[in-house]
Amino acid sequence: MKTELDLHDRSLTLHRFPKRSNETLQAWDAGDEYLINNVEGMALPDNQNIVVVNDNFGALACWFSDRHNVTLMSDSFISHKGAQQNLADNQCNQVSFLSTMDDIPENTDLVLMQLPKSNRHLVWLLSQLRKTLPASCPIVAVNKAKEIHTSTLKLFEKYLGETKTSLAWKKHRLVFSTANAQPVIDVDPMTIWGIEGEGIQLKNLPNVYSGESLDLGARFMLQHLPQDPTLKHVIDLGCGNGLLSVKMGQLNPQARLTSVDESFMAVESAKQNLLDNLGDARDIQCIANNCLDGFTPDCADMVMCNPPFHQQQAITDHIAWQMFCDAKQILNQGGKLLVIGNRHLGYDAKLKRLFGDKNVKLVASNNKFVILQATKNPAKLGAKQ
């Protein structure tokens, strides 16, 4: 796996986050290289104020901080940590960090953007750029050519302004746009909907997974969450909008709830939804984090999760494995990990490898999903503590 980005007689050493000894995926892609080549061709004067949006692991921030003032905007906690790691490893100049819910800096001279996967997130970003930037500020976005559709360009033209595209290079294409669309369209960042029969209403910020409707996996999981008066602390890992946390809170009013996600928007949505549906007297905590980094061992009675199989644009199963390993670490003896996943992902084999064959059972299944429960071995009588 290549870790050296070599362009224009410069070299950067870049790693994904968290670093893994057996990593097979690069920390940058051809889209980053295309943006770098394009901006280098502009021959910008030094000390420009550059805003980089959705910089996956900081390749662009590292590159441009050499001569410019860089602000990195991302909804991803992992992107922030990866960029910080790579900036430090390459002894780069200081970079400012913002989430994509923060205001666009007003003194921006150039915006560079990796296009987000979610159209809701894209529309939010375009509307914020239009509200803040002068028409003189160039905006250059990039994505795989096959992901830039006519509908994508229409969103640019509607919410941002005049837009054109480049030729394809290494299967990527640039999008050049100007903040001059009329009229300026105000976009509400929050999408709100309820779940029939559950008495739950959910607020969803633009980059929340399945933020416009209840996904099938969550609907299935809702039917199989336990009511257990012995539960003192429940963790919802990869919480999204916090739906499972809310339901567990309704079923188990005695339980302390911790909701964790790597998306800042997911964490804020979960916080709002827990407060709205359970009230402000409950013991709840919502945290942006890389899985369960920094959690105290043996601190929870139950962890529930629906692991993602994407990290940024890449398909990978290492996140699920990290979630399972972290959950085992922080569960009490006898604590339970409740997992939902697509049938084809084979989570049962991973869980049996980690928890032992006899400690993993099938809770429920349908033609698409399985729900599995893994129990951390209870301490044996007479065992050394």
UniProtKB/Swiss-Prot annotation:
Keyword Zinc: no
Keyword vocabulary terms for this entry: Cytoplasm, Methyltransferase, rRNA processing, S-adenosyl-L-methionine, Transferase
One Pfam family this sequence matches: MTS
Top-level enzyme category: transferase
GO CC annotation terms, alphabetical: cytoplasm
Superkingdom in the source lineage: Bacteria
Molecular function (Gene Ontology), one example: 23S rRNA (guanine(1835)-N(2))-methyltransferase activity
SUPFAM superfamilies assigned: S-adenosyl-L-methionine-dependent methyltransferases
Reaction catalysed by this enzyme: guanosine(1835) in 23S rRNA + S-adenosyl-L-methionine = N(2)-methylguanosine(1835) in 23S rRNA + S-adenosyl-L-homocysteine + H(+)
Compartments, as annotated in UniProt: Cytoplasm
Endoplasmic reticulum found in the keyword field: no
Record EC number: 2.1.1.174
Family note: Belongs to the methyltransferase superfamily. RlmG family.
Task performed by this protein: Specifically methylates the guanine in position 1835 (m2G1835) of 23S rRNA.
Record protein name field: Ribosomal RNA large subunit methyltransferase G
Organism name: Vibrio campbellii (strain ATCC BAA-1116)
